[in-house]
Amino acid sequence: AKELQTNYFYKYNTSLNGLMIHHNIPPQEFLKYVHTIDLSFMREDTVMRRELEQLDMEKFIFTNGSAEHAENILTHLGIYDLFGRDKVFDIEDAGYVPKPEAKTFDLMVKKFGINPKETIYIEDIAKNLSIGHKRGCTTVWLINDEHFGKMDADKDFISHKIENLSLFLKEIRLLKSQ
C-alpha cells in the first residue's frame, strides 16, 4: 500500500489523483480518511501569527489537501482566524486536479482575483512552484528534507529559498515599509 501511495504521489502529484484515475476512489472519503490525523504535536506559532498580522498584504492558502485539513492545521498553529474558509483554495475547488497543473493554478488566481506578477507564491513542494513562475509570480521554496518536497529544488523556477517562514514574512514587511 505504501509503495502504491508513493508511486501515485510521484506520478500524479497526489496519491488521491492516482487512486481516482486507477481505482475510482471517491475523493471526499479518501480525504476524510487520510486527513484524520493527530495534530496534537503542533503548537500555536505566536511569531508567525504576529508576522502575518503585521504584514499588510492579502494572504491565501493554496493546498492539494482539503479545506478541512487546512483549517485543522491553521487552527493548531493559532492562525485560522487570519484566513477563514474564504481564503482557502483546496483540492475540491480545483476539481481534484492537483498542483502544479496550470488549470488548477489559473482557477485559484481567478477565485482570489490575484495578479501573479504581484504575488509571492510560497510552497513546501518545490516542483509546485513551476506554474507560478510561468505565470509571473515571485516563487519561494520553504526548504525541507522531504524527498518529494525537495525534488526539483535546483530548478530556475525558484526565485528564493528560505528556511524560516516567519523570518521571511518579517523581512517582506520590513522591505515594504522602506
Annotate each predicted stretch with a short phrase.
Residues 2-4, 35-39, 57, 92, ...:
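Short, contiguous strand/loop micro-motifs
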Residues 50-59:
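A short, Lys/Arg-enriched amphipathic alpha-helix followed by its capping loop at the start of a domain
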